[in-house]
C-alpha cells in the first residue's frame, strides 16, 4: 500500500462504483446505445468494474473499450519524448452512441481533453459523459465529471493514488502528502 491516508477502502470503492453505475443507468434511462471507454490504465480497470455492475443490474451486455491518450497529450506537442504508446481498443462503432468515458482521478482536465480528442478520431458519438472515481479539483480546462465517486479537495502538492490488486480490481484510494 502507498504511504498516506486511505480516503476510500475496498468497501468504499465498491460502493462508489455501484452508485456510479446506478447514476449512469438513471441518466441514460438504461443501457441501450450506451458504451463505456476507459482511459489507460486505471480508467480501463474501473470501466470494466462499472460495466460488470451495469450488466448485473440490467441483465444486458454493455460494450467496453479502452483508449490510450499518449499521442493526444498537449504537454508533448512538437517535442514528444519516447513514451510507450499503449493500445487503444474500441471494437465497436461510436457513431450515435452515448459514451461514458471513465478515469480514476480527475485533476486538471487535460487527460480528459486528450481522451475526448482520441474518441472523436474514432467516430462521432451522440454525447460523451465522464465518470471518475475521484475528483480532486484544480481544473485548468472547463471540464467536469458527470459521475463522481468521491470529491476530495487537495493541495497541488498532494497526490491521489488509486490502488489495484493483482487482478486489476480497485482496492483503495490513498491521499499522499
UniProtKB/Swiss-Prot annotation:
A single MF term (Gene Ontology): uracil phosphoribosyltransferase activity
Keywords: Glycosyltransferase, Transcription, Transcription regulation, Transferase
InterPro entries per UniProt: PRibTrfase_dom, PRTase-like, PyrR, PyrR_bifunctional
Reaction it catalyzes: UMP + diphosphate = 5-phospho-alpha-D-ribose 1-diphosphate + uracil
Gene name for this UniProt entry: pyrR
Similarity-based family: Belongs to the purine/pyrimidine phosphoribosyltransferase family. PyrR subfamily.
GO annotation terms (biological process): regulation of DNA-templated transcription
Superkingdom in the source lineage: Bacteria
Pfam families tied to this protein: Pribosyltran
Coiled-coil intervals: none
Official protein name in the record: Bifunctional protein PyrR
Enzyme class: transferase
Lineage, highest ranks first: Bacteria, Pseudomonadati, Thermodesulfobacteriota, Desulfuromonadia, Geobacterales
Extent of motif PRPP-binding: 99-111
Protein's job: Regulates the transcription of the pyrimidine nucleotide (pyr) operon in response to exogenous pyrimidines.
E.C. numbers: 2.4.2.9
